[in-house]
C-alpha cells in the first residue's frame, strides 16, 4: 500500500514540484546563486512542464526567467542521443552581459561543461517541433561602447521573439533546423523582422540557408540559397569586414535603410529597390554578378559590380560594368546616398543635366581606383541626343578636383549624335550638333566642369536657322563658360578661319578675328537679298544673343560684297552696332 501511495504521489504536481525544488536548491548551492521552479507537471515520464523557471547570476541579478517550458520526449537513445517530440517555451526573458572581460553566465558554462569527454564526443539532440513565443533577449558588452547607428552585436535587445521550427538537430557546434517562422523586434536599432522561413544550418563556420524568405517592415527577399560564412561567431561583431556572403537572390524588394542597419558604413541610404542577382565576398568588397536593379518609377540597370570599401574608398578597386542602363533624372534625384559620400545624403544634379530628363545606355564600364579610373560606354542616349565613349576617359584625383585627360587612341573621346545643344545650354540661336571630340579638363563636381583642352570635328552645327557642316576645332577650351578656340569652317556656303573666344556669361560676349574667304549670305539665311556673297577679314567685339540683339564693334579689312553679279569693295570699315528688336 505504501508503495502504491508513493507511486501515486510522485505523479501529482505537488510532489513533482517539491522534488524539483530539492534539485533546484542543490544547484543553487552548487552554483552559489538562486534557481527556482514554481511548478512542475510530469505525465508518464515522457511529458514534462515547468512553470516559473528563474535563474539568477552570481550577483543575484536575473539571468533568465521563463513562464512555461513544455517538453515531450520520444525516447532517449544510447550513445548520447536525445529524441524529443516537442519543446514549447511561452514567455520569458534572458539578460546576458559581459563586464570586465567576464560573462554573467560563465559560471553555468563552466559547471555544465564536461572536461572528461573525449575529443569530438558530444550530445546529439533531435527535436521534431520547437515553438517559442513572447520571449525577450538582452545582451550587453559593457566593455565596449555602443555604436550610434545600426545593429550592434555587442549590444542587442530583442523583443517579441517568436520561433516555429521542425526537424531540429543539435550536435555540438552544428545546429540544423527547418524554420517555419522567425520574428522579432531589435529595439536598439529599430529593425523588425516580421517573418523568416528557410532550411538552415548554424555553426561557428557561419549560417547556411536554403529556400530563404525574409519579410520585414520594408523588404521582401526570396533566395534559393544564401550563406554567411565565418571563422567564428565573433566575426559577426565585425560584419562588414569578416562575414563572407555567398548567395543568389530572386527578384526581391529591399530597403536600403534596413541594409544599412547591418552595414553602418551605408548609413544615410533610404530607398526601396527591386533587385536580383548573385552576391559573393564581404560587404566591404562585395561582388555582385548578373545583377538587375529597379529604382523609382522608370529606372533600372543590369550588370556586374564590385562594391568598394566605403571606409577605405581611396584604396578600394572599382570594377563596375553596366550591361544596360535606363535612368530618369527624377528617379536619380530621389536616391539617398551614404553620409560617407554626401553629407546630406542627396545627389546634387546640375540644372544642365536635369534637362536631359533620362539616360539610356549599354556596356558602361568603370575601372580603377578612387584616385584614378576610366569610364567608357558604347552609347548613352537622352531626350536631347546621344554620345559614345567607346575609347574611355581617364580621371585622376587631385587635391579638390578630378583631372580628366584625352585618350591616346587618336580617334575621339566622345562622339556626339544629334545633340540638341541649344536646349541643353538654353540658347535659342543654337540647334542640333553632330561631331566627335578629344578633350582634357578639370571636374570639381557635376556643376563645375572645365575643358582645358578641346579639339574635334563638328559634322553639323545648327545656328540661326542654318545647318553648318565641316567645322574643325583645335586649340580649344571651355573654362568658366568661356569658349576659346581656333576654328576652320569648310561649309558649302561658308569658308573661314576663326580665332577668338565666346563668353556665354551674361549675354554672349564675342571677341574674335575671322579670315572669311566665302560666305553665301542668302543661303546662310543672313542675306538681305538673293545671290549675296561676302568675303573679308573681321575683328569683332560684340555682345548679344542673336541678330536682333547685338551691341559692339566690328572692324573689316579687304571687304568684298557681291550681289546679283555686282561687287562692292571696301578696304577698311569700322562698325559700331547697337541693335534690338525695337531699334537698329
Where do the model's predicted regions map?
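Transmembrane beta-strand segments that form the barrel wall of outer-membrane beta-barrel proteins
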Residues: 179-183, 207-214, 286-293, 372-380, ...
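Secondary-structure transition motifs
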Residues: 31-33, 52-173, 191, 219-231, ...
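N-terminal type II signal-anchor transmembrane helix
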Residues: 1-31
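Tryptophan-anchored aromatic micro-motifs
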Residues: 127-137, 414, 455-456, 554-558
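Residues on the solvent-exposed faces and adjacent turns
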Residues: 39, 52, 73-75, 91, ...
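Hydrophobic residues on conserved beta-strands that form the core of alpha/beta folds
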Residues: 37, 50, 66, 84, ...
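Amphipathic hydrophobic-ligand
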Residues: 30-33, 59-72, 144-163, 189-199, ...
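Short extracytoplasmic
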Residues: 29-52
Amino acid at each position: 500500500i505504501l508503495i502504491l501511495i508513493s507511486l501515486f504521489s510522485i505523479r501529482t504536481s505537488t510532489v513533482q514540484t517539491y522534488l524539483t525544488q530539492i534539485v533546484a536548491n542543490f544547484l543553487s548551492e552548487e552554483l552559489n546563486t538562486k534557481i527556482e521552479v514554481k511548478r512542475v507537471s510530469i505525465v508518464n515520464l515522457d511529458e514534462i512542464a515547468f512553470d516559473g523557471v528563474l535563474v539568477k547570476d552570481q550577483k543575484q541579478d536575473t539571468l533568465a526567467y521563463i513562464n512555461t517550458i513544455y517538453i515531450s520526449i520520444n525516447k532517449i537513445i544510447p550513445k548520447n542521443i536525445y529524441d524529443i517530440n516537442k519543446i514549447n517555451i511561452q514567455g520569458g526573458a534572458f539578460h546576458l552581459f559581459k563586464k570586465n572581460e567576464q560573462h554573467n553566465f560563465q559560471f553555468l558554462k563552466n559547471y555544465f561543461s564536461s572536461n572528461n569527454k573525449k575529443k569530438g564526443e558530444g550530445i546529439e539532440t533531435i527535436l521534431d517541433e520547437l515553438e517559442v513565443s513572447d520571449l525577450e533577449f538582452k545582451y550587453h558588452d559593457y566593455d565596449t561602447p555602443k555604436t550610434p547607428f545600426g545593429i550592434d552585436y555587442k549590444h542587442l535587445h530583442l523583443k517579441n521573439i517568436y520561433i516555429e521550427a521542425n526537424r531540429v538537430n543539435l550536435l555540438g557546434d552544428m545546429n540544423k533546423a527547418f524554420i517555419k517562422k522567425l520574428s522579432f523586434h531589435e529595439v536598439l536599432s529599430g529593425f523588425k523582422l516580421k517573418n523568416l522561413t528557410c532550411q538552415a544550418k548554424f555553426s561557428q563556420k557561419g549560417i547556411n540557408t536554403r529556400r530563404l524568405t525574409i519579410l520585414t517592415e520594408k523588404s521582401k527577399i526570396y533566395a534559393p540559397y544564401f550563406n554567411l560564412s565565418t571563422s567564428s561567431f565573433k566575426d559577426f561583431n565585425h560584419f562588414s569586414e569578416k562575414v563572407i556572403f555567398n548567395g543568389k537572390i530572386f527578384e526581391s524588394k529591399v530597403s536600403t535603410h534596413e541594409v544599412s542597419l547591418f552595414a553602418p558604413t551605408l548609413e544615410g541610404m533610404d530607398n526601396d529597390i527591386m533587385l536580383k542577382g548573385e552576391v559573393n565576398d564581404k560587404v566591404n568588397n562585395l561582388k555582385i554578378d548578373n545583377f538587375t536593379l529597379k529604382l523609382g518609377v522608370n529606372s533600372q540597370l543590369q550588370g556586374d559590380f564590385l562594391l568598394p570599401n566605403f571606409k577605405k574608398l581611396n584604396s578600394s578597386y572599382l570594377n563596375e560594368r553596366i550591361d544596360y542602363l535606363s535612368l530618369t533624372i527624377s528617379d536619380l534625384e530621389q536616391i539617398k546616398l551614404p553620409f560617407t559620400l554626401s553629407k546630406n545624403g542627396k545627389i546634387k544634379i546640375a540644372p544642365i543635366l536635369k534637362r536631359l530628363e533620362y539616360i539610356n545606355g549599354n556596356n558602361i564600364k568603370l575601372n580603377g581606383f578612387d584616385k584614378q579610373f576610366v569610364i567608357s560606354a558604347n552609347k548613352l542616349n537622352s531626350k536631347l541626343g546621344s554620345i559614345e565613349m567607346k575609347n574611355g576617359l581617364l580621371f585622376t584625383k587631385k587635391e579638390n578636383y578630378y583631372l580628366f585627360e584625352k585618350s591616346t587612341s587618336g580617334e575621339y573621346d566622345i562622339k556626339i549624335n544629334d545633340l540638341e545643344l541649344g536646349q541643353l545650354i538654353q540658347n535659342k540661336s543654337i540647334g542640333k550638333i553632330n561631331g566627335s571630340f578629344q578633350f582634357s579638363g578639370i571636374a570639381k563636381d557635376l556643376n563645375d566642369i572645365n575643358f582645358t583642352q578641346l579639339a574635334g570635328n563638328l559634322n553639323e552645327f545648327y545656328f540661326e536657322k542654318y545647318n553648318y557642316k565641316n567645322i574643325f576645332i583645335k586649340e580649344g577650351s571651355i573654362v568658366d563658360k568661356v569658349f576659346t578656340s581656333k576654328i576652320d569652317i569648310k561649309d558649302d556656303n561658308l569658308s573661314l578661319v576663326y580665332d577668338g573666344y565666346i563668353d556665354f556669361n551674361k549675354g554672349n560676349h564675342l571677341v574674335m578675328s575671322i579670315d572669311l574667304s566665302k560666305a553665301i549670305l542668302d543661303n546662310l539665311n543672313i542675306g538681305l537679298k538673293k545671290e549675296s556673297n561676302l568675303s573679308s577679314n573681321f575683328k569683332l567685339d560684340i555682345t548679344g544673343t542673336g541678330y536682333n540683339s547685338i551691341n559692339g564693334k566690328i572692324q573689316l579689312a579687304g571687304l568684298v560684297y557681291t550681289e546679283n553679279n555686282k561687287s562692292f569693295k571696301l578696304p577698311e570699315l569700322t562698325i559700331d552696332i547697337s541693335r534690338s528688336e525695337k531699334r537698329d
